[in-house]
């Protein structure tokens, strides 16, 4: 268990990001973490939708006190032609009507996400853990803005990249890295802290939970967070019920919160392909040490699915509201 996790979440909130955010909120309710802020980035949908979706999650959890920052709206070099609306919906969050949605103009911080990232890490050097759930544009910009950022961050957990050439947006690339390959390249090349990567293939093969469990076990829990997620995922559940419920981002969050959930991991030196016609955005593992460089990431190969599901269930039952945390009672209700 990670004690006193000082956390910043960089995210492109869609469906699985929302569940990851809920896990982080539960960790704070259990007095295991402190969320210093959420930085929004383009990805699953446009930046404005991401900001709105983030606020909806925090509103449902009773945690609008957490600062939310508007970040990069497009990639460093070439923005993707399409987002992930085909899965997450036109608004990136299931296209359901959310009553009394928080007004971004009122709740989003005035500072830019990149300014916040460089500031919080300079004020708390070697204390901040970054959970990166979307394209890495904000992180790359923080590196360019303040090179000390590379050494000020304590650790990073990244959902992104692939290890066996299996893509989910192109034939060879994972979505987050494909959205901004140059940003992924800058981050993996420049950061000096430990980096853990939860890649697409691990999500695909190791977090494949049945929709029956999602719907009839997790989905039956009566809590504000599950009511929100049930509404947001209703169309996806109806469309993919016979398939597996593959959720990338909450697994990455779970590994940061409970490192023991990672049952198999390996270190590698990795690179990002920037020019390939068919492979742009793919993560390349240097299996034969052709670059002669030290390993720069730890890759999660497998997780303990039972521990992961237990964590999801416990978080789904937890009272996430700020009033509960202030009373020191963030346990199951």
Language-model segments: residues:
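Short, mixed-charge aromatic SLiMs
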Residues: 44-49, 76-78, 162-166, 270-288
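Conformational coupling and interaction surfaces
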Residues: 2-5, 23-34, 175-182, 194-333
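Active-site histidine-anchored catalytic micro-motif
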Residues: 2-55, 63-64, 95-208
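Sparse, context-dependent recognition of short Cys/His-centered cofactor- or disulfide-binding micro-motifs
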Residues: 53, 78, 102, 141, ...
């Amino acid at each position: 268990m990670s004690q006193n996790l000082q956390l910043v979440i960089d995210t492109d909130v869609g469906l699985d990001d929302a569940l990851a955010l809920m896990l982080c909120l539960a960790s704070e309710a259990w007095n295991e973490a402190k969320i210093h802020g959420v930085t929004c980035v383009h990805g699953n949908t446009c930046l404005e939708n991401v900001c709105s979706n983030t606020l909806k999650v925090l509103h449902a959890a009773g945690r609008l006190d957490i600062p939310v920052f508007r970040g990069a709206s497009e990639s460093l070099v070439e923005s993707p032609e399409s987002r992930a609306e085909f899965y997450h919906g036109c608004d990136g969050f299931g296209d359901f009507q959310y009553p009394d949605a928080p007004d971004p103009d009122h709740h989003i911080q005035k500072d830019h996400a990149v300014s916040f990232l460089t500031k919080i890490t300079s004020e708390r050097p070697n204390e901040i853990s970054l959970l990166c759930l979307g394209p890495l544009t904000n992180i790359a910009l923080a590196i360019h803005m303040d090179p000390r950022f590379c050494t000020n961050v304590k650790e990073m957990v990244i959902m992104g990249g692939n290890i066996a050439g299996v893509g989910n947006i192109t034939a060879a690339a994972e979505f987050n890295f494909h959205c901004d390959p140059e940003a992924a390249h800058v981050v993996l090349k420049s950061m000096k802290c430990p980096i853990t990567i939860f890649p697409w293939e691990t999500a695909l093969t190791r977090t494949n939970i049945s929709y029956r469990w999602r719907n009839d076990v997790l989905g039956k829990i009566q809590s504000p967070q599950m009511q929100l997620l049930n509404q947001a995922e209703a169309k996806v559940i109806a469309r993919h019920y016979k398939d597996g419920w593959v959720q990338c981002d909450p697994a990455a969050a779970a590994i940061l919160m409970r490192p023991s959930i990672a049952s198999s991991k390996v270190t590698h030196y990795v690179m990002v392909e920037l020019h390939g016609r068919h492979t742009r955005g793919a993560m390349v593992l240097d299996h034969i040490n052709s670059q002669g460089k030290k390993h720069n990431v730890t890759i999660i190969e497998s997780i303990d699915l039972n521990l992961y599901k237990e964590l999801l269930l416990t978080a789904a039952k937890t009272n996430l509201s700020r009033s509960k945390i202030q009373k020191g009672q963030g346990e199951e209700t």
